[in-house]
Amino acid sequence: YTSLTYFSGFHGENSNFVVTMTESAVWADGRYFVQAEKEIAGTEIQLMRMGEPGVPTAEEYCGKVLPEGGTLGLCGLTANCALVNNLKKELEPKHGSIKTLFLEDELWVEGRPARPATPAWILPKEYAGFSPAEKLEQLRAKLKEQGCTAQLVGKLDNLAWLLNLRAMDIECTPYAMAYCYVTPDRAVLFIDQARVTPEAKAELEANGVTLADYDSILDGMAAETEPQTVLAESATVNYAVYQVLENNPALTVKDAADPLLAMKGVKNEVELAHLRESHLRDAVAMVRFQIELENRLASGEEL
């Protein structure tokens, strides 16, 4: 967690950091060009301004700097499978390989912040419109249409919608760091169990969801013996988990679009009603602000 910031000093988002034996580079998008320049000033790190002409992607850069027959190490828990697939294509001309490493666990021992574990709770059905059990049945029907019997959900916003699960692991975003494995008759939520409120645990169990430890995801999926065709979207499932799924002989992995994306986009009547109410409240707040602003300006107040 936050290992990119620890090694590079850069505090932005949507970034990659590459280190070779002789050089290093960090990627930043347009929101962070100025910040990144300041934070890496005085170091050997090159700033790669994403989207600028002539600036290679992290994948292209790795393909260029990796020596013939070289090995690229990466943390498979923080790199999605689609990124790794792109890396493999770039490394192929040099017969390069990829290896999952967890070097930050060895190098960053002291002072490392804990993984976010804000209280996890369940959004009531009166706001969500459907219970977790109802949404799980809807998902299973969609999976059947796509020729699958199971799914590994790794995208946090999709998981939040599926189980009505809420937390504050990401500032200003109500997500909980977790995974969910859904089969025709089971749903397993991999999450730090101590953070789940008693009410949320009871609600999940009542809706057919069992809890497992967050860190047991790799061992848990490796231990699955029930044959399943598992939908796992490479763009939203990390490489380490995807590898475990592919290496389990009981599981057939299908890389396809996550049906939850479209499902959560279709708002039910309860959600629509709350959206309308929210827009009305926003409108009232905006009008009050404009009136206050105009009155202060009219009185000659300097703002």
Give a label for each model feature.
Residues 156-161, 235-238, 292, 303:
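A glycine-rich phosphate-binding loop feature that marks nucleotide/adenosyl-phosphate handling sites
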